[in-house]
């Protein structure tokens, strides 16, 4: 399992019409990308990357569980074979508490039309 406490959050709707969700610490980062029109692109729908392009891919997320305290991400091992067993992620949300509601709203919009997002209180 990859575990880290994120101290930085960035959400963005880019000029290229992408939704980007990014969490990072001094040693790790997680980036999720999706087209803002929520339609799959040439390589897939939702792009996942953690700690480098070696551990990136499209449509590899099986489930993302979020709460105000943390995100837990499970990847589909069959779709993420190149991830070398890095299929489970736990990211503590050590970001400003005032930013957490907006981050959760962004994730709801980001995962609209999928069954990947599970919210916990």
Language-model region placement:
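A short, structured beta-strand/loop element
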Residues: 65-81
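Acidic, aromatic-enriched beta-alpha/helix-loop junctions
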Residues: 29-68
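Generic detection of short hydrophobic beta-strand segments and adjacent strand-loop junctions
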Residues: 4, 48, 89-93
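Mixed-charge, glycine-accented linear interaction segment located at domain edges/termini
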Residues: 86-121
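Charge-rich, low-complexity N-terminal segments
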Residues: 1-29
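Extended Gly/Ser/Thr-rich low-complexity repeat segments
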Residues: 29-40, 82-96
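Residues that cap or initiate secondary-structure elements
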Residues: 10, 27, 38, 52-54, ...
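Short polybasic amphipathic segments
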Residues: 19-21, 45-47, 71-73
